[in-house]
């Protein structure tokens, strides 16, 4: 039996159970009451049989029969309780979602759906029962997820602390090529002199972000130890840097400008010239502007489209500006006040049709009218830029780790509470028939 078949343990269990229930036996009986549901002897026997088959094929030891039966019974009780919760929440897994899940399983196994059906049949598993057990599993999982999510609270400081730990681990082997400018604040300087130096440092940062040459500014202004080398410190790991540098450099990518920041001797500015060994995350942001016209009982799709076509022609002909037309026509009050401008955003923020337009439209081109769920639009891409999101990606990773930890803890607690609050009566099983 292929490895993947072991992951279908639950499916096989219910397939075998269905087979045994298809030919009723006198010995089949209710063995456990779980609130208003029942667990049958055939359910227990089917699961015991399947567990033993899988254990034998994988050469795994099993506990004695009494303990194994107890474990099987507990699994059936927990599943029943979760399905009862799902029914209370009105959770239903429709055929479309089920089809997608089955297709995903087939894809993971590098099989087509017909091939998956044949593999199941070879193992004695009915495809229809396979689908229904998947529906049960998905239903129970969704009920569990809904309830457990409500119990999880992740504080921002928890994310920050874990992200910092992850970042330190990541940076142990990373090398940075950095340059540095130091503006000295003399001992005994007045408040006005300190503020003047701070303003000068900020002005230098602004110039650097607008493309000024770092080395030239270092020659002109820096009082640091590498001023005569254009401020360049070369390649260093974080642990090799002066502490004041190491404290500021996190997961900064190539080209990052850091500062100005203060120390006991003055203000500092760092540029990351290059990085070795750091996996950075970069995203493209788009600054676009649009005009949205929503349809209504008095404005049809054709009417909205014609209005935008006329506005587009007026803008292209120079008779109107985009900003004026947006303020006059747009049904999006937030952007209309800004001449239709949406600001810097990642395309993923938008609905699919709008996302596709701003990803493919050449800069400075006004699109033809197109429709989304919000209405009819014309859009112009003003500019694009690549933005380093490594720090945000690290925080996202930290959040996911914390969520996973807490979810597992809270899921166990929820299941225990669910079981403790349920009416469960075990009527006793027959002698093991396996």
From Swiss-Prot:
EC number: 5.2.1.8
SUPFAM superfamilies associated with the record: FKBP-like, Triger factor/SurA peptide-binding domain-like
Pfam families, per the entry: Rotamase_3 (PF13616), SurA_N (PF09312)
GO cellular component, one term: outer membrane-bounded periplasmic space
Enzymatic reactions: [protein]-peptidylproline (omega=180) = [protein]-peptidylproline (omega=0)
Keywords assigned: Chaperone, Isomerase, Periplasm, Repeat, Rotamase, Signal
Domain PpiC: 173-274, 283-383
PANTHER family per record: CHAPERONE SURA (PTHR47637:SF1)
Role, per record: Chaperone involved in the correct folding and assembly of outer membrane proteins. Recognizes specific patterns of aromatic residues and the orientation of their side chains, which are found more frequently in integral outer membrane proteins. May act in both early periplasmic and late outer membrane-associated steps of protein maturation.
Protein name: Chaperone SurA
The organism's taxonomic lineage, starting at the top: Bacteria, Pseudomonadati, Pseudomonadota, Gammaproteobacteria, Vibrionales
